Regions:
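Regulatory N- and C-terminal appendages and interdomain linkers associated
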Residues: 1-24, 31-33, 41, 54, ...
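Structured loop/turn residues at beta-strand edges in well-structured enzyme cores
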Residues: 20, 71, 207
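Short coil/loop linkers at secondary-structure junctions
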Residues: 18, 72, 158-162
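Short, conserved clusters of charged catalytic residues that mark active-site
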Residues: 7, 29, 58-61, 71, ...
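Active-site acidic catalytic loop and adjacent metal/ATP-binding pocket
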Residues: 24, 31-38, 46, 76, ...
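Glycine-rich loop motifs involved in handling phospho/adenylate chemistry
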Residues: 23-26, 50-51, 136-137, 189
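ATP-binding pocket architecture of kinase catalytic cores
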Residues: 32-143, 147, 153-157, 182
């Protein structure tokens, strides 16, 4: 993916970060790019989301909503929604995956993550769900659950699951959906996993769990 160097420098200059040093961060499963920018000892994260391929506005709505509820989504330092640039608070490198790989105890990390989910479910839907965010449908939930048979099992078994097996798995979830509908509705964080959760020292409770 082409790097929009001149546009990035203009955006950073307009945000007061002219001349900042850049280092590339890991990409995610999208067209977005991320860079850590450093200036006079300060750090921030640049999101480059090319218009036409990505839209930063849903990210902004959800990040601001989570922050307003006391959770630790990245703060928004500067934005150019038309150009697809955001300058974000740098939450650090202590992702749960790195901590676990380094031998940290799993239980405290997962307890922290569960505290976030409990906190979200305590928020009335009218308070937790930003305006303009589509409902999380049964079909979408089944699609997410089917990632197990579409991707994980084939990778582990080194062969595709037979089509009738994958269909049967989806049918089981369809039968379970009425039970899910009884659960109170709240905001759903679709990428809530160890690579997108960060321990933030100096914050307490659910706020100690950074959300990417």
């Amino acid at each position: 993916m082409a790097v929009r160097t001149a546009e990035i420098e203009n955006f950073l200059a307009s945000a007061g970060w002219a001349g900042a040093d850049h280092s590339t961060l890991a990409e995610d499963a999208s067209f977005r790019r991320y860079e850590r920018v450093t200036r006079s000892g300060e750090q921030a994260v640049l999101m480059d989301a090319p218009p036409g391929k990505e839209d930063v506005r849903p990210f902004l709505r959800i990040a601001r909503k989570l922050t307003s509820l006391g959770f630790s989504a990245p703060g928004i330092l500067a934005e150019d929604t038309a150009a697809g640039f955001l300058l974000l608070e740098d939450l650090g490198d202590a992702t749960f995956s790195r901590l676990l790989n380094a031998g940290e105890a799993a239980a405290p990390l997962y307890e922290m993550a569960v505290d976030v989910l409990i906190g979200l479910h305590k928020c009335p839907p009218a308070d937790a769900v930003p305006a303009g965010i589509a409902p999380y449908s049964d079909a979408l939930l089944i699609d997410e659950a089917a990632l197990l048979v579409d991707w994980y099992l084939p990778a582990v078994a080194d062969e595709d699951l037979p089509a009738d097996g994958a269909a049967a798995y989806r049918e089981i979830w369809a039968v379970l959906m009425p039970l899910v509908s009884d659960v109170p509705k709240t905001l759903v964080l679709r990428d809530f996993h160890v690579d997108n959760l960060i321990r933030i020292d100096g914050r307490d409770g659910a706020a100690a769990c950074g959300l990417l």
